[in-house]
């Protein structure tokens, strides 16, 4: 449905040249939810704006539904853009128009008959859960409701593709979850292809089928969500995955934790499990093999793309030789082990 090939985008600011994208290629199959994740300034927004040519690539090819957009005339491009809806971090609603009027706007601009506009807008507001807000104004809506109006407006022309530019980053966590569930529901009901960009791995984990990691204008990793969470290939992907798990050292342990070993101490370990290592009984196996005992302090597990992953804080009791051997064995079995200190 979306195929970007060798996209390069260069900006010129006076005598300065800024390369925002460098030889980026990306394929989003029809009906998928595809996420692009990266830090601020990585090139995410430039990339998604190249899909509908809000930013025209310096080099490269942009195919949407089999049509090469970079070769179209302005009138042809305007027509093609009707098949590409877009929502943004800021909702960009017209404050002087009601909810109905905001959603109706693209249909009015397309000279759609009034009866058809009424039918379509009513249908869309019902779809996004705002069937009772026809006559409300944006100033009377919450942030989540405003984004629902923006989604309905983006769907007004029956697009085949929806682009989401940091669409949930201005929302609180509960509202973010509800908007993501709405996007997932729309994807299922309408077969809509969704390309979203974000700096939050929680967004990717919750609704995406595939994910690409962007850094300094280059895609450094892309695969299914389950594969990236199971076997992240780059340090940046690992960092984003770790950001979805939050496990603090309990206060009483922080007070006792020492950086260097001392008499009768035990190491405190942070264990990170991904993919196959999650379900394998590795801790009980280390106890049998190396005569060590693990006292689990706290743990957190989660799912992404059907794959379980998680982290654990544990004290490992045993001789220095046995604990070192057990740690090495865990690492051989795809567990990331960090010695946080000694207690």
UniProtKB/Swiss-Prot annotation:
It is found in: Cell inner membrane. One of its GO terms (molecular function) is ABC-type D-methionine transporter activity. ATP binds at residues 38-45. Residues 2-241 form the ABC transporter domain. Its EC number is 7.4.2.11. The keyword Cell inner membrane applies. It is a peripheral membrane protein. Keywords: Amino-acid transport, ATP-binding, Cell inner membrane, Cell membrane, Membrane, Nucleotide-binding, Translocase, Transport. It comes from the Bacteria. One of its GO terms (cellular component) is Gram-negative-bacterium-type cell wall. It holds the Pfam family ABC_tran. It catalyses: L-methionine(out) + ATP + H2O = L-methionine(in) + ADP + phosphate + H(+); D-methionine(out) + ATP + H2O = D-methionine(in) + ADP + phosphate + H(+). Its main location: membrane. The keyword Cell inner membrane applies. Part of the ABC transporter complex MetNIQ involved in methionine import. Responsible for energy coupling to the transport system. NCBIfam families: ABC_MetN. Belongs to the ABC transporter superfamily. Methionine importer (TC 3.A.1.24) family. This is Methionine import ATP-binding protein MetN. The lineage of its organism: Bacteria, Pseudomonadati, Pseudomonadota, Gammaproteobacteria, Enterobacterales. The gene is metN.
């Amino acid at each position: 449905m979306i195929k970007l090939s060798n996209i390069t985008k260069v900006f010129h600011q006076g005598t300065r040249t800024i390369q925002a994208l460098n030889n980026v290629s990306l394929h989003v199959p029809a009906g998928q939810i595809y996420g692009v994740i990266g830090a601020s300034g990585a090139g995410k927004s430039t990339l998604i704006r190249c899909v509908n040519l809000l930013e025209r690539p310096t080099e490269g090819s942009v195919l949407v539904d089999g049509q090469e957009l970079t070769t179209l005339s302005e009138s042809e491009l305007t027509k093609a853009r009707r098949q590409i809806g877009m929502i943004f971090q800021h909702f960009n609603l017209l404050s002087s128009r009601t909810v109905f009027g905001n959603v109706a706007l693209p249909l009015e601009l397309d000279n759609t008959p009034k009866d058809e506009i009424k039918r379509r807008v009513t249908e869309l507001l019902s779809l996004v859960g705002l069937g009772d807000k026809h006559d409300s104004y944006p100033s009377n809506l919450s942030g989540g409701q405003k984004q629902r109006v923006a989604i309905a407006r983006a769907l007004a022309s029956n697009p085949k593709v929806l682009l989401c530019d940091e669409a949930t980053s201005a929302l609180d966590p509960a509202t973010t979850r509800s908007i993501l569930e709405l996007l997932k529901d729309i994807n299922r009901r309408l077969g809509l292809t969704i390309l979203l960009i974000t700096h939050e791995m929680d967004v990717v984990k919750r609704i995406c089928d595939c994910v690409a990691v962007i850094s300094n204008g280059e895609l450094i990793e892309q695969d299914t969500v389950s594969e990236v969470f199971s076997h992240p290939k780059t340090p940046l992907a690992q960092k984003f995955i770790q950001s979805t798990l939050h496990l603090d050292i309990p206060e009483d342990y922080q007070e006792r934790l020492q950086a260097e070993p001392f008499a009768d101490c035990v190491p405190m370990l942070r264990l990170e499990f991904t993919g196959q290592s999650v379900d394998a009984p590795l801790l009980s196996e280390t106890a049998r093999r190396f005569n060590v005992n693990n006292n689990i302090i706290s743990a957190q597990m989660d799912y992404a793309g059907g794959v379980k992953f998680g982290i654990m804080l544990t004290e490992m009791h045993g001789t220095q030789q046995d604990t070192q051997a057990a740690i090495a064995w865990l690492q051989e079995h795809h567990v990331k082990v960090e010695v946080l200190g000694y207690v």
